[in-house]
Curated annotation (Swiss-Prot):
Family statement drawn from the similarity comment of this UniProt entry: Belongs to the Rieske iron-sulfur protein family.
Entries under InterPro entries matching the protein: Cyt_b6_f_Rieske, Rieske_2Fe-2S, Rieske_2Fe-2S_sf, Rieske_Fe-S_prot, Rieske_Fe-S_prot_C, TAT_signal
Broad enzyme group: translocase
Identification of the protein by name: Cytochrome b6-f complex iron-sulfur subunit
Coiled coil ranges: none
Gene field: petC
Organism of this sequence: Prochlorococcus marinus subsp. pastoris (strain CCMP1986 / NIES-2087 / MED4)
Length: 178
């Protein structure tokens, strides 16, 4: 075997070593601090491989079909956390089952949350008086558009909310929110 001469072996001085160590430590700390920030802006999708977002109740717990139907009667419209965290109405239909669609509760006028008025049997916006029928179709302005629709599916008792991209059955037009 041949020996390398001292001219062929690179040497690292003390200053160069300390600079490398300082840079490595600072980089590690910066990446460690950025990890939670990145997770905040890119959260994992809930719901699994079938797509959709798990509907969550007011405490942030996933909504189950059996639990929801045990506490809600036919005709009930109650809020859950749906797509993108928006308030979304789950509808219990006349057969006592969770409906196939949900309604985004954000008013299309100025973005207020629109409550369900069971006495008037419609959604009435408290901000400027816009009114929507039982299916979320605007019946009185100033809101220019109907409430956005979302698919509601039940997968193994879990209630999932999915993006609605088909024709809006209330207006027979392409959805404005897609």
């Amino acid at each position: 075997m041949t020996q390398l001469s001292s001219n062929d072996v690179p040497s690292m001085g003390r200053r160069q070593f300390m600079n490398l160590l300082t840079f490595g430590t600072a980089t590690g700390v910066a990446l460690g601090a950025l990890y939670p920030v990145a997770n905040y802006f890119m959260p994992l999708r809930a719901g699994g491989g079938g797509g959709g977002t798990s509907a969550k109740d007011e405490l942030g717990n996933p909504v189950t079909k059996t639990g929801w139907l045990a506490s809600h009667q036919a005709g009930d419209r109650s809020l859950v956390q749906g797509l993108k965290g928006d308030p979304t109405y789950l509808i219990v239909n006349s057969e006592g089952e969770i409906g196939e669609f949900g309604l985004n509760a954000i008013c299309t006028h100025l973005g207020c949350v629109v409550p369900w008025d069971s006495g008037a049997n419609k959604f009435i916006c408290p901000c400027h008086g816009s009114q929507y029928d039982t299916n979320g179709k605007v019946v009185r302005g100033p809101a220019p558009l109907s409430l956005a629709l979302a698919h509601v599916d039940v997968d193994d008792d879990a209630v999932l909310v999915k993006q609605w991209s088909e024709t809006d059955f209330r207006t027979n037009e392409n959805p404005w929110w897609a």
